[in-house]
Each structure stands twice: as structure tokens, then as C-alpha cells.
Amino acid sequence: MAGKTGIRGAQIQDDSITGSDIDESTLRYPVTSLWSGNDPGTTYTVADGDYVILVSTRPTAQGGIDSAITITMPSASTSGRMIIIKDAGGHSQTNAITIQRAGSDNFDGNPSTTSIQHSSDAESITLISNGNSSWYKI
């Protein structure tokens, strides 16, 4: 693995990857795209397999969903679960992307923070769960 980044001599037990090297060229991350061809309407609930969510709120003629959207996070009960939400259309200042908690979870450990606004055009927000009740921006 000279010149590569990865895990040498991997031995991940429960999901059984034993005795082989893993390098970053073999890693793939699930991507969900929300745009005019896959328009969820004004709400989307993060699915179990979601990791990267690309959202285009641009006008429909430009390939977007042409509306604000609320994305509901899953429970923060899985420690280390990471979700990346990207304003792929660069239009979130016009059509906001709101990220909503699940149940009684919160953001950044603040019980009164039940949602966050993603309103920076073309930016992404990375959230990671503490395994208890909070999603943290990192």
C-alpha cells in the first residue's frame, strides 16, 4: 500500500473484513440527490442508508425542487453516525434548507435547539451523533 491511505491488515470483526488491506480507492459513500428528477416535495426524512445528501432548491427549470425544504434527521442514538447535507444547487438563501430534529433530540447539545437553518449558498453542513440525543455540527 505504498503511497496509499487506508487500513492495513484490516480485521473488522462483526461485519467480517479479515486479512485484507482497505485503501480509500475501495471506499464508497452513499449519496442521495434531491432535485427536480427526485423531488420529495417540501419534506425529506433521512433514511438509514443516507450519508451525503445533495439538495438543489434552484428553480425547476434549472433542475432544482424550486422550494424550501425541511430535512428531518434520524434519531441521534447511533454514536458516530455522520450525515453531510450539501446545498448542491447554491440556492439555499432563496429557498431555505431547514434541518429538523427527530423526537426530542437536539443540535450541539442545546435542548432548545430543535432545528438549524442551512442558508449559506453552496455550503455543506456535517453533523455527527453523540449516540445519546444530540447531533453536533463539525
Give the label of every model feature segment.
Residues 101-121:
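Terminal beta-strand-rich extracellular "head" domains
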Residues 4, 14, 119:
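Small/polar loops that bind or transfer phosphate-bearing groups
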